[in-house]
């Protein structure tokens, strides 16, 4: 994200995940699983397990059912399911931000095109941010952000491999 070296990109789609950028570089962790916020636990249950209780996940609870979680924002943005979903998501993002202290939280995924979702998620997230100046914004890349990031990573990996061979 232009203007920031430290930020958290949160994707909400069929899954919920995040990319942590620190010092201008994506931090993947030792095992490549940094940012898997769907698996954050509270009271012994992961975020996905708690969302399963709201009836917005697929049958096995491994992914979100897009039709089920989009409809509350389009039809009844104040419904208990929408409010609970946003509170759980805001809490998980806030906990991740507490650990990483980003200058910005960037929202991406299919729902960022829904202003009601973005506004309500921002309102649910802000009380969970320890630093009130943390910017909460929407990705300029919209739903294409993860694809652009994966493409860039593939390119960087290929170039790195070429240079490693060249240096031998």
Residue ranges of model-derived segments:
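Phosphate-binding/catalytic loop of phosphoryl-transfer enzymes
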Residues: 1-46, 155, 161-168
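ATP-binding/phosphotransfer module of carbohydrate and carboxylate kinases, centering on a glycine-rich
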Residues: 1-3, 42-168
């Amino acid at each position: 994200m232009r203007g920031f070296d430290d930020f958290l990109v949160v994707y909400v789609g069929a899954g919920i995940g995040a990319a942590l950028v620190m010092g201008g570089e994506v931090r993947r962790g030792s095992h490549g699983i940094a940012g898997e916020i769907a698996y954050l636990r509270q009271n012994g249950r992961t975020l996905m397990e708690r969302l399963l209780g709201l009836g917005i996940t697929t049958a096995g609870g491994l992914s979100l059912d897009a039709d089920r979680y989009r409809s509350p924002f389009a039809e009844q943005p104040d419904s208990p399911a929408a409010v609970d979903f946003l509170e759980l998501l805001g809490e998980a993002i806030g906990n991740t931000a507490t650990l990483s202290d980003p200058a910005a939280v960037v929202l991406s995924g299919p729902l960022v095109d829904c202003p009601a979702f973005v506004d309500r998620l921002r309102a649910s997230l802000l009380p969970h941010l320890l630093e009130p100046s943390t910017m909460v914004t929407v990705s300029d890349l919209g739903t294409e952000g993860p694809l652009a990031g994966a493409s860039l990573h593939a390119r960087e990996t290929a170039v790195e491999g070429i240079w490693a061979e060249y240096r031998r």
